[in-house]
Regions:
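Non-catalytic interaction/Regulatory regions outside core domains
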Residues: 1-130
Length: 130
């Protein structure tokens, strides 16, 4: 099995553009297992309400859960985490050794967005990488 990477940019760009096409999406990025942003894009015209370093603080909890596999055998693997705040909702989706970080408008209907994004990310993982 090939390691899932975002080095093949055409796949990332395709998925990123698709995710950013949702009206409620503000930002999409990929965080590695060290908590560093590997790549990310804001929707055109969006003014960030937080610096990338502030998003990293939100990732601490998500990374901790992602790295803890203790409950996988009984509860199953982690599908995603949603953190809702007054000004933004943050969706964290584990994809192999990475976390996809997505911020949305706070009033977004999260479940339909997540289902579409999960399908998009599943499609991208099925593509054979060299």
């Amino acid at each position: 099995m090939s390691k899932f990477t975002f080095e093949n940019m055409s796949y990332w760009e395709s998925s990123s553009k698709y995710i950013l096409s949702f009206p409620e999406i503000r930002f999409v990025g990929v965080v590695n297992n060290m908590g560093n942003l590997v790549i990310g894009d804001y929707k055109k015209g969006i003014i960030p309400i937080a610096e990338i370093d502030q998003y990293k603080m939100c990732m601490e909890h998500a990374l901790e859960l992602f790295m803890k596999k203790d409950l996988d055998s009984t509860l199953g693997p982690l599908d995603y985490i949603v953190s809702k705040r007054k000004n933004v909702a943050i969706i964290t989706i584990p994809v192999r050794d990475y976390l996809v970080l997505i911020s949305t408008e706070p009033d977004a209907k999260i479940e339909p967005i997540i289902e579409e994004i999960l399908q998009s990310l599943n499609d991208i993982q099925q593509v054979k990488r060299i």
